[in-house]
């Protein structure tokens, strides 16, 4: 590697820092460059292996991301074996695509400079506080991992190179100015139309309907006249929030005594370092310090640790678990105390102890309110779980009624009115409860009451036990109950057909120049002109922009059906060429070029996959 990367590789701070950053790269598969393939690979892409470790890390990261995003809904997806299998395949496909892109980037000899790698490190959000690089946060996080600087720098370089390839592909599409102006004029075009509406509802009222037509329509469309499955439910609800228990001073003191670790802030230590490549350089720096030299100034001038040097050698506050062994073993006890020259894996160090914050246990008064809330909640949960078990046992022992469960709970069961899947009572509107009601397991035969449910828990602190007291299966409504509804539908259908036939005849006359007489005879006339834009998504706008351009002093005619189902005759009088502000034109071009770039990129990936030798590991093929 070039000198600046070797400098990074020999930085104590970077030795600490590089390990943790790779966690973020696992999300995009970059860790594949760091984990050895071995024979037990997840996939082999040409000669590059994607290890099982890389695949499992990527899959777990994606799963964790989804869990954070979806919350409680994720558990339902996780229980779906087919969905999780598909998710695993998607993650593997992504890793394969990234390997193909990496190989193609190397084939094109794309590269990233050392300075770009360094700037990417400084810009990593994980190491920033309030948008700025923070040395203390940097050290605290990165001492927890064991990845070398060389490994991380190469992984980051590979990721940036792949992104360079993607950006190159995405930036190849463009539009000429003439094309842009022509397209903008077309997109911004407006059309001036007049409308004449045939009111289908008015026609429907005039349509004669026979009993035979009503019966025939009913028979052919019975599924449209269903009464949904209906239920009446009796239930008992248990809620930990209603079971608050008193909390005594003794309870609070006991919790405080038993959980001291929760109220203890561990000791923190602050060090500054100067790192050199050779022992002679370190001795020279130590000599200057002993003569009164300014530590911060010397660190900025002479330290090889590129991160701490920017802060005058300051490494920020460190807890014991994050302090490197070199600093622990320096034996510094007093503030301002300097070490001698320390040999380390990254060169030579001079360390100064800047400050110590001793471990501190918060007083009982400081945490009393928090403890009281915790103890109260724990007592409520204990009472809730005890009552839940008692009610569950009672409901199981007497499955023919909720009487025993009522006695155990100390409350009477609540009885709902009739409801269906579409209007579940709000009090019962939880997925586990709905599943129990609607899965059929609690329904008795021929509408009779069924058995009691098991205890159904919701959100960990609420529970229900219920039984279906009455049930009505889904059924077709009798014709007598829906006759008027069926008649209206038949009339409306006949009116729609008549309106379209009438409109077609009028359209022929309009195009033949006989429209005035025909429209007058039909009791119709065109309304005032209105201007429509191409962006309109309604049926009238869509039909207007599908019409041929009008001739001079002669409208272009057409017909459409509006949002209410009425048939509308259209007269297109004028086409106005549009204009577009430059910012809108720029946004339009950007959208088109991005879409085209996506198409090109997908074609590239398809071709890379087609030409590659891809083998899925045996273990994954069997899953």
Swiss-Prot record:
Could you name the domain of life of the organism this protein comes from?
Bacteria
One BP term from GO: chaperone-mediated protein folding
Membrane topology is: Single-pass type II membrane protein
Q: Per UniProt, what does mutating residue 313 to A/R do?
A: Cannot complement a surA null mutant or reduce the htrA-lacZ activity induced by periplasmic stresses
Sequence ranges on the Periplasmic membrane side: 37-623
Question: In this protein, which residues make up the domain named PpiC?
Answer: 266-355
- Membrane topology (Cytoplasmic): 1-15
Q: What induces it?
A: By heat shock via the sigma factor RpoH. Member of the two-component system CpxA/CpxR regulon.
Any GO molecular function:
peptidyl-prolyl cis-trans isomerase activity
- Which keywords does this chain's UniProt record carry? Cell inner membrane, Cell membrane, Chaperone, Membrane, Stress response, Transmembrane, Transmembrane helix
Where is it mainly found? membrane
The UniProt disruption phenotype note reads: Deletion of the gene retards the release of a translocating outer membrane protein into the periplasm. Null mutation leads to the induction of the periplasmic stress response. Null mutants are hypersensitive to hydrophobic antibiotics such as novobiocin and to detergents such as SDS, and exhibit altered outer membrane proteins profile. In contrast, another study shows that inactivation of the gene has no discernible effect on the levels of outer membrane proteins. Lack of the gene confers increased temperature-sensitivity in a degP mutant. (Microbial infection) Deletion of the gene leads to partial reduction in the plating efficiency of bacteriophage T4.
The protein's matches in InterPro entries, at most eight in alphabetical order, are given as: PPIase_dom_sf (IPR046357), PPIase_PpiC (IPR000297), PPIase_PpiC_CS (IPR023058), PpiD_chaperone (IPR052029), Trigger_fact/SurA_dom_sf (IPR027304)
Which purpose does this protein serve, as stated in its record? Answer: Chaperone that functions as a gatekeeper on the periplasmic side of the SecYEG translocon. Facilitates the translocation of precursor proteins across SecYEG by interacting with the translocating substrate. Also plays a role in the release of newly synthesized secreted proteins at the periplasmic exit site of the Sec translocon. May be involved in the early periplasmic folding of many newly translocated proteins. Acts as a transient subunit of the Sec translocon that binds to the lateral gate of SecY and is detached by nascent membrane proteins but not by SecA.
Q: What is known of its domains?
A: Consists of an N-terminal helix that anchors PpiD in the inner membrane, followed by three domains that face the periplasm. The first or the third domain are probably chaperone domains. The second domain is a parvulin-like domain, which is devoid of catalytic activity. It shows a parvulin fold and resembles most closely the inactive first parvulin domain of SurA, which is part of the chaperone unit of this protein and presumably involved in substrate recognition.
Family affiliation: Belongs to the PpiD chaperone family.
Q: Any remaining note in the record?
A: Overexpression restores viability of surA skp double deletion mutant but it does not completely compensate for the growth defect caused by the simultaneous lack of the SurA and Skp chaperones. Suppression of surA skp lethality does not require the parvulin domain but the membrane-localization of PpiD. In the absence of both SurA and Skp, overproduction of PpiD can, at least in part, counteract the defects in the biogenesis of OmpA and possibly of other OMPs.
Q: Under what name is this protein listed? A: Periplasmic chaperone PpiD
